A protein has these predicted regions:
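Mobile gating loops/cap/lid regions near enzyme active sites that modulate substrate access
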Residues: 394-532
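Non-catalytic accessory segments of hydrolases
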Residues: 20-183, 448-461, 469-476, 510, ...
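Gly/Ala-rich beta-loop-alpha elbow adjacent to hydrolase catalytic centers
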Residues: 213-217
Length: 532
């Protein structure tokens, strides 16, 4: 069983239901509109209410439709001389399960990015942000992911789209023989390549780029560090997750055959499958079963090009960007929301552990059954959600921190602020911290009922975060992480929200150290989707 539409949004820490509004980025008219000349075209944006320049929907690659469906991202076609690209509206959202009003309209011409920058400045630090959504959903037009708070503090903020689910990770037997078919990961690389080549035109320093993300966005950050050991990034932010967080992987062509049958195309064994599937309208993929279940089966394959099985061996061989300072951490109740997200399949804990979504095949089941007691939780679903939080978020962060912190400057946080920011469970759960790290203000515009106290916390969080982005090597204001048991920052602690308290990771990682971490070197294990 997969994601329901509203619950997909919960994974991103965004507003839902009646609390949701979807405003365009705030703007004002100030004389002539700002223009930036790029090799692909001149782009024209607008000034926001703080006189920052904003450019939305700039293509960083060609359309992914037609013959480019299931190809690596292709270069942007050159524009005619004198072309001025209108960058005042968000671009299309990449195709994904279910269509809705939260993001812009879906279209395969979706590899676009957004830039917020001060009106004046040069050689400014750059923060590139990647949204989350389990690699099956999400988009940079999410109203909580605006960059005004960074531009006001002389940091250029960039967000971008990637392909999702079946369009990003088809896991096809026809592909992957000579190059990676993890197209979503390749999209990330293309976006960062664009930033390196073009951000100076917006006043940014291509030699001072920090790449960060939340949930699957931070998994993408980690893939980039593993795939580019010599990267010029000066900092990385992994909020909640990393390369050991998943997603799960199905056998080659298994998921694609099931979807192909639904849309009237042959199986992989019959031949001509991709040729047929390339002709299917993107909305025709959105069958009821695809939207509720199948969409989660399409995830990055272990190709040992863009996703690896032996990260431990790569680290030992120096094939990881250990020179890049890393900020990582979690909210204090990551799993709470997942008791709802997977509520249709997690009320039987024993059965839940066998599902594709739980994705814990590498861990002996008896250990997992012994590690959780339903009397400690409000329901079996709540216990299953907590287990999911351990498996996907807390323990991967703990495991790779143990592995890497001896050779990589690493700082860890834990977010305690008890605010729901539109989520239907008490905070802080998965995604709660996002609008606080991004500084609130416009990032809170889509959520009703935000208090002055919440904005004060967002100001505090964003201030130290921006200071770290400007000088990652100096650290964020607390001690570096160490393996097993070390210092971490407690953020948003009740009664002392506008301060950073210190804690010890050893007070929180017991179940990771004893149950999960010993088996994470074996992750991922192929999972049969027909048994999900």
């Amino acid at each position: 069983m997969g994601f329901l539409h509203g619950l997909i949004s919960l994974l991103l820490g965004i507003c839902i239901g009646a609390e949701c509004r979807n405003p365009r980025a705030a703007r004002q008219v100030v004389g002539g509109a700002p223009r930036v000349k790029l090799p692909q075209a001149t782009v024209e944006g607008f000034f926001d209410l703080h006189n920052n320049t904003v450019f939305l929907g700039i293509p960083f690659a060609a359309t992914t439709g037609g013959p480019n469906r299931w190809r690596a991202p292709q270069p942007v076609p050159p524009a005619r001389p004198g072309t001025v690209f209108n960058a005042t509206q968000y671009g299309a959202t990449c195709p994904q399960a279910i269509s809705g009003a939260l993001y812009t309209q879906q279209d395969e011409d979706c590899l676009n990015l957004n830039v917020w920058a001060p009106a004046k400045g040069s050689n400014l630090p750059v923060f590139v942000y990647m949204y989350g959504g389990a690699m099956v959903t999400g988009g940079s037009s999410n109203p909580q992911l605006q960059g005004q708070n960074f531009a006001r503090k002389d940091v250029i903020f960039v967000s971008f789209n990637t392909r999702e689910s079946i369009f990003a990770y088809p896991n096809s037997a026809e592909l992957g023989k000579t190059e990676s078919q993890n197209f979503g990961i390749l999209d990330v690389e293309k976006a960062l390549e664009w930033v390196q080549r073009n951000i100076a035109a917006f006043g940014g320093d291509p030699n001072h780029v920090v790449f960060g993300g939340h949930s699957s966005g931070s998994v993408q950050v980690d893939h980039y560090l593993w795939n580019h050991p010599q990267t010029k990034l000066v900092g990385a932010v992994q909020m909640a997750a990393n390369a050991k967080s998943g997603p799960a992987v199905a056998p080659t062509n298994q998921a694609l055959d099931i979807v192909a049958t639904e849309v009237g195309c042959p199986s992989g064994a019959q031949g001509g499958q991709l040729e047929c599937l390339r002709k299917v309208n993107l909305y025709d993929f959105q069958t009821e079963k695809f939207n509720t279940t199948y969409n989660t089966w399409f995830t990055p394959v272990v190709d040992n090009v863009t996703r690896f099985q032996d990260y431990e061996g790569r680290l030992a061989a120096g094939k990881y960007a250990s020179h890049v300072p890393l900020l990582t951490g979690n909210s204090n109740a990551e799993g709470a929301i997942f008791g709802l997200v997977y509520g249709a399949e997690n009320s039987d804990f024993n059965a839940w552990l066998d599902t594709f979504d739980a994705d814990v095949a590498e861990i002996p089941k008896d250990l997992l059954l012994a590690a959780y007691n339903v009397s400690d939780y409000a329901s079996v679903s709540a216990m299953s959600g907590a287990q999911y939080g351990d498996a996907r978020f807390y323990c991967p962060v703990d495991y790779l921190r143990d592995l890497r912190s001896a050779s990589q400057d690493t700082w860890t946080y834990r977010f305690f602020a008890n605010y729901s920011v539109g989520l239907p469970v008490p905070g802080p759960t998965h995604g709660t911290e996002i609008p606080f790290f991004l500084g609130g203000n416009e990032c809170f515009d889509a959520i009703e009922g935000i208090t002055e106290t919440e904005q004060a916390l967002a100001d505090f969080q964003n201030d130290w975060f921006v200071a770290w982005i400007k000088n990652p090597k100096a650290g964020p204001g607390w001690g570096r992480s160490t393996p097993k048991n070390g210092t971490f920052a407690k953020l948003g602690v009740s009664g002392n929200e506008l301060a950073i308290e210190l804690g010890a990771t050893g007070d929180y990682n017991g179940i990771c150290q004893s149950v999960y971490n010993p088996y994470l070197p074996e992750y991922p294990v192929l999972l049969d989707v027909t048994a999900a």
